[in-house]
């Protein structure tokens, strides 16, 4: 049992390291909050940019012209960020990850929530 717990804990560390690592081109990943402006104003990840999920297809080109750039998206529960992920992939972005909720994203990336 101890071996299983150790393995699971180690896997979490590896996942966290993978998500906070730099992209293939050596750049930090782009973190996008796909919630509403009101939700953003109540708290968001430090370093994230706000692009609501319903306009991400129109606005993404202003922050990520390179379609190989590593992009992480998050929202309140993971539903809107999953929609945003699908939109970005349809537009040809190749390295998009759904981090789920704001809290999950902050935990996974070891980031700070700014309120």
Where in the sequence are the language-model features?
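Short, surface-exposed ligand- or partner-binding patches at beta-edge/loop junctions that are enriched
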Residues: 74
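Bacterial N-terminal signal peptides
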Residues: 8-18
